[in-house]
Design a protein with these regions (language model features):
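N-terminal membrane topogenesis motif
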Residues: 1-20, 75, 79
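Membrane-water interface segments that mark the loop-to-transmembrane alpha-helix transition
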Residues: 59-104
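Membrane-interface helix-loop junctions in multi-pass transport and translocation proteins
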Residues: 147, 158-199, 203
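Membrane-interface junctions at transmembrane-helix termini in multi-pass inner-membrane proteins
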Residues: 130-152
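Alpha-helical transmembrane segments of multi-pass membrane proteins
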Residues: 101, 112-136, 162
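Short membrane-interface helical motifs at transmembrane helix boundaries
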Residues: 94-117, 173
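Small-residue-rich midsections of specific transmembrane alpha-helices
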Residues: 42-64, 88, 125-128
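Interfacial/gating helices of multi-pass transporter permease domains
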Residues: 26-48, 115, 179-188
Length: 213
Protein backbone atom coordinates (compact mmCIF):
# COMPACT_ATOMS: atom_id res chain seq x y z
CA UNK A 1 0.00 0.00 0.00
CA UNK A 2 2.83 2.37 0.90
CA UNK A 3 4.42 1.72 -2.49
CA UNK A 4 1.18 2.59 -4.30
CA UNK A 5 0.88 5.85 -2.34
CA UNK A 6 4.49 6.71 -3.18
CA UNK A 7 3.90 6.13 -6.88
CA UNK A 8 0.66 8.15 -6.88
CA UNK A 9 2.33 11.06 -5.09
CA UNK A 10 5.27 10.83 -7.47
CA UNK A 11 3.03 11.02 -10.55
CA UNK A 12 1.11 14.01 -9.18
CA UNK A 13 4.33 15.85 -8.34
CA UNK A 14 5.78 15.10 -11.78
CA UNK A 15 2.71 16.56 -13.50
CA UNK A 16 2.74 19.69 -11.31
CA UNK A 17 6.45 20.30 -11.91
CA UNK A 18 5.99 19.71 -15.64
CA UNK A 19 3.26 22.33 -15.69
CA UNK A 20 5.50 24.80 -13.85
CA UNK A 21 8.42 24.70 -16.29
CA UNK A 22 6.08 24.59 -19.31
CA UNK A 23 4.31 27.74 -18.15
CA UNK A 24 7.67 29.34 -17.42
CA UNK A 25 9.00 28.70 -20.93
CA UNK A 26 5.76 29.84 -22.54
CA UNK A 27 5.67 33.12 -20.65
CA UNK A 28 9.37 33.89 -20.33
CA UNK A 29 10.13 37.17 -22.12
CA UNK A 30 12.42 36.54 -25.08
CA UNK A 31 11.45 32.86 -25.34
CA UNK A 32 7.80 32.90 -26.40
CA UNK A 33 6.55 31.27 -29.61
CA UNK A 34 9.92 31.38 -31.37
CA UNK A 35 11.71 29.70 -28.48
CA UNK A 36 9.00 27.08 -28.13
CA UNK A 37 9.20 26.32 -31.86
CA UNK A 38 12.96 25.74 -31.64
CA UNK A 39 12.61 23.77 -28.40
CA UNK A 40 9.78 21.61 -29.76
CA UNK A 41 11.38 20.89 -33.15
CA UNK A 42 14.51 19.55 -31.49
CA UNK A 43 12.54 17.65 -28.89
CA UNK A 44 10.44 15.88 -31.54
CA UNK A 45 13.52 14.39 -33.22
CA UNK A 46 14.89 13.42 -29.81
CA UNK A 47 11.58 11.76 -28.92
CA UNK A 48 11.63 9.80 -32.18
CA UNK A 49 15.11 8.39 -31.54
CA UNK A 50 14.18 7.76 -27.92
CA UNK A 51 11.15 5.75 -29.02
CA UNK A 52 13.33 3.58 -31.24
CA UNK A 53 15.95 3.05 -28.52
CA UNK A 54 13.82 2.40 -25.44
CA UNK A 55 10.08 2.04 -26.17
CA UNK A 56 8.56 -0.76 -24.13
CA UNK A 57 11.91 -1.71 -22.59
CA UNK A 58 10.94 -1.37 -18.90
CA UNK A 59 7.79 -3.48 -19.30
CA UNK A 60 9.53 -6.17 -21.35
CA UNK A 61 12.46 -6.48 -18.95
CA UNK A 62 10.16 -6.36 -15.92
CA UNK A 63 8.16 -9.29 -17.33
CA UNK A 64 11.24 -11.37 -18.14
CA UNK A 65 12.87 -10.71 -14.76
CA UNK A 66 9.70 -11.46 -12.77
CA UNK A 67 9.22 -14.72 -14.71
CA UNK A 68 12.73 -15.85 -13.79
CA UNK A 69 12.27 -14.88 -10.15
CA UNK A 70 8.91 -16.69 -10.00
CA UNK A 71 10.71 -20.00 -10.62
CA UNK A 72 13.56 -19.14 -8.27
CA UNK A 73 16.06 -18.41 -11.03
CA UNK A 74 17.79 -15.38 -9.54
CA UNK A 75 20.90 -15.83 -11.70
CA UNK A 76 18.71 -15.93 -14.79
CA UNK A 77 17.03 -12.67 -13.77
CA UNK A 78 20.41 -11.00 -13.30
CA UNK A 79 21.66 -12.39 -16.61
CA UNK A 80 18.65 -10.88 -18.42
CA UNK A 81 19.43 -7.54 -16.79
CA UNK A 82 23.10 -7.58 -17.78
CA UNK A 83 22.41 -8.58 -21.39
CA UNK A 84 19.72 -5.89 -21.69
CA UNK A 85 22.05 -3.31 -20.15
CA UNK A 86 24.78 -4.05 -22.68
CA UNK A 87 22.34 -4.19 -25.60
CA UNK A 88 20.43 -1.01 -24.89
CA UNK A 89 23.58 0.77 -23.78
CA UNK A 90 24.93 0.22 -27.29
CA UNK A 91 21.63 1.23 -28.92
CA UNK A 92 21.47 4.36 -26.78
CA UNK A 93 25.07 5.24 -27.64
CA UNK A 94 24.32 4.90 -31.35
CA UNK A 95 21.23 7.09 -30.97
CA UNK A 96 23.29 9.70 -29.15
CA UNK A 97 25.96 9.75 -31.87
CA UNK A 98 23.36 9.94 -34.65
CA UNK A 99 21.74 12.96 -33.06
CA UNK A 100 25.02 14.66 -32.12
CA UNK A 101 26.77 14.28 -35.47
CA UNK A 102 23.60 14.58 -37.52
CA UNK A 103 22.29 17.69 -35.76
CA UNK A 104 23.30 20.04 -38.57
CA UNK A 105 21.68 17.96 -41.31
CA UNK A 106 18.53 17.34 -39.28
CA UNK A 107 18.14 21.01 -38.38
CA UNK A 108 18.64 22.30 -41.91
CA UNK A 109 17.02 19.51 -43.95
CA UNK A 110 14.43 17.78 -41.75
CA UNK A 111 13.03 20.32 -39.34
CA UNK A 112 14.03 23.24 -41.60
CA UNK A 113 14.63 25.25 -38.44
CA UNK A 114 18.40 25.93 -38.45
CA UNK A 115 18.23 27.37 -34.94
CA UNK A 116 17.34 23.90 -33.60
CA UNK A 117 20.86 22.56 -34.27
CA UNK A 118 22.17 23.48 -30.82
CA UNK A 119 19.01 22.09 -29.24
CA UNK A 120 19.63 18.72 -30.90
CA UNK A 121 23.26 18.67 -29.80
CA UNK A 122 22.22 19.53 -26.24
CA UNK A 123 19.69 16.69 -26.16
CA UNK A 124 21.87 13.99 -27.74
CA UNK A 125 23.45 12.56 -24.53
CA UNK A 126 19.99 12.15 -23.00
CA UNK A 127 19.22 9.27 -25.38
CA UNK A 128 22.01 7.19 -23.86
CA UNK A 129 21.01 8.01 -20.28
CA UNK A 130 17.33 7.23 -20.87
CA UNK A 131 18.12 3.96 -22.67
CA UNK A 132 20.21 2.74 -19.74
CA UNK A 133 17.72 4.03 -17.17
CA UNK A 134 14.88 2.17 -18.89
CA UNK A 135 16.74 -1.11 -18.33
CA UNK A 136 17.28 -0.33 -14.64
CA UNK A 137 13.62 0.61 -14.28
CA UNK A 138 12.50 -2.67 -15.84
CA UNK A 139 14.85 -4.63 -13.60
CA UNK A 140 13.67 -2.94 -10.41
CA UNK A 141 10.02 -3.24 -11.42
CA UNK A 142 10.54 -6.95 -12.08
CA UNK A 143 11.85 -7.25 -8.53
CA UNK A 144 8.84 -5.32 -7.23
CA UNK A 145 10.93 -2.40 -5.98
CA UNK A 146 8.61 0.12 -7.61
CA UNK A 147 9.48 2.92 -5.19
CA UNK A 148 12.99 3.11 -6.64
CA UNK A 149 11.76 3.92 -10.14
CA UNK A 150 9.19 6.38 -8.75
CA UNK A 151 11.94 8.22 -6.87
CA UNK A 152 14.14 8.30 -9.96
CA UNK A 153 11.36 9.77 -12.10
CA UNK A 154 10.52 12.34 -9.44
CA UNK A 155 14.19 13.30 -9.06
CA UNK A 156 14.47 13.74 -12.82
CA UNK A 157 11.47 16.05 -12.96
CA UNK A 158 12.66 18.11 -9.99
CA UNK A 159 16.06 18.60 -11.63
CA UNK A 160 14.44 19.34 -14.99
CA UNK A 161 12.21 22.05 -13.55
CA UNK A 162 14.89 23.74 -11.44
CA UNK A 163 17.64 23.48 -14.06
CA UNK A 164 15.41 24.62 -16.92
CA UNK A 165 14.56 27.84 -15.13
CA UNK A 166 18.10 28.38 -13.81
CA UNK A 167 19.93 27.68 -17.07
CA UNK A 168 17.52 29.68 -19.23
CA UNK A 169 17.88 32.67 -16.89
CA UNK A 170 21.68 32.45 -16.93
CA UNK A 171 21.78 32.06 -20.72
CA UNK A 172 19.37 34.97 -21.16
CA UNK A 173 21.60 37.16 -19.00
CA UNK A 174 24.86 36.15 -20.70
CA UNK A 175 23.57 36.27 -24.29
CA UNK A 176 21.26 39.27 -23.93
CA UNK A 177 18.19 37.05 -24.34
CA UNK A 178 19.18 34.99 -27.38
CA UNK A 179 16.14 32.83 -28.14
CA UNK A 180 18.22 30.15 -29.86
CA UNK A 181 20.62 29.84 -26.93
CA UNK A 182 17.79 29.88 -24.39
CA UNK A 183 16.09 26.98 -26.20
CA UNK A 184 19.37 25.06 -26.24
CA UNK A 185 19.84 25.82 -22.55
CA UNK A 186 16.40 24.44 -21.76
CA UNK A 187 17.39 21.19 -23.42
CA UNK A 188 20.72 21.06 -21.61
CA UNK A 189 18.54 20.98 -18.50
CA UNK A 190 16.67 17.98 -19.93
CA UNK A 191 19.92 16.11 -20.51
CA UNK A 192 21.22 16.88 -17.01
CA UNK A 193 17.89 15.77 -15.54
CA UNK A 194 18.02 12.42 -17.35
CA UNK A 195 21.57 11.99 -16.05
CA UNK A 196 20.37 12.59 -12.47
CA UNK A 197 17.81 9.79 -12.85
CA UNK A 198 20.39 7.46 -14.38
CA UNK A 199 22.91 8.28 -11.63
CA UNK A 200 20.35 7.56 -8.89
CA UNK A 201 19.36 4.19 -10.39
CA UNK A 202 22.99 3.22 -10.99
CA UNK A 203 24.11 4.15 -7.48
CA UNK A 204 21.12 2.39 -5.90
CA UNK A 205 22.01 -0.76 -7.81
CA UNK A 206 25.69 -0.55 -6.88
CA UNK A 207 25.00 0.04 -3.19
CA UNK A 208 22.21 -2.55 -2.88
CA UNK A 209 23.47 -5.15 -5.34
CA UNK A 210 24.10 -7.85 -2.73
CA UNK A 211 20.84 -7.10 -0.95
CA UNK A 212 18.87 -7.17 -4.21
CA UNK A 213 20.38 -10.44 -5.30
Amino acid sequence: MQGVVTIMFSQILIKVLGLIYTLYLTNRQGFGDAGNAIYASGYQIYALLLTVSSIGVPNAISKLVSERLAVGDNKGANRIFKVALATFGCIGAVGTMLLFFGAHTIAYSWTQIPESELTLVALSPAIFFVSISSVFRGYFNGRRTLKVTARAQTLEQIFKTILTIAIVEVVAYVTSTSTEMMAAGANVATTLATFSSFAYLFMYYRLRRKEIG
